[in-house]
Amino acid sequence: MKKLLLTLSCLAFVQLVLAQKLDKMHWFNEPEKWDIKNNALSMFVTPQTDYWRISHYGFTVDDAPFYYGTYGGEFEVKVKITGNYKARFDQMGLMLRIDQQNYIKAGIEFVDGKYNLSTVVTHKTSDWSVIKLEKPAPFVWIKAVRRLDAVEVFYSFDDKEYTMMRNAYLQDNTPVMVGMMAASPDGKGFDAQFEHFSVKHLPDARRLKWLEDNADQ
């Protein structure tokens, strides 16, 4: 019984630490309705908001909800996303952001009644790539790995087998705002939930190489 109580206490402590970590993050464009419960972020996405710069459409917008922490160096970030998508371009997922002109957002985007794995990469101007899903997915895991000057973006339906959806440039040796974003450019908003958000530090590959090369000095 004591072991069981100790195990439960440890689990409760871990959940508390994770919840506190989520609570300590920051809003950029805070939505009117949001909540954190059981280490999950829920929000009603602000209507007619988005992140996009110039290309194809000729406008720049930077006004969608984004809940983030700031990280330097190399890392892996992932999250489980579930959305009640309703209107064209309703979207949610991860965002890695240096500033208004340099960011990557990746997740699910609802277009013409279809669910798409979507990535937007912005360096002064935005580009957009999609992978259409054959059928709606109740949830998707999105993962991004930042190594040196590149970010690899992956998706998964079970948090076990991941498939790459994009490899994109992101400036090296620069702090990055990392977190969860959602937007409803053409709609009236929707309910979005983010679960199991985590960021794992990855040792700097160049430092490890230097240490290996200079081990005997």
Predicted regions mapped to residue ranges:
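Bacterial Sec-dependent N-terminal signal peptides
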Residues: M1-K21
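Extracellular glycan-recognition regions
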Residues: Q20-Q217
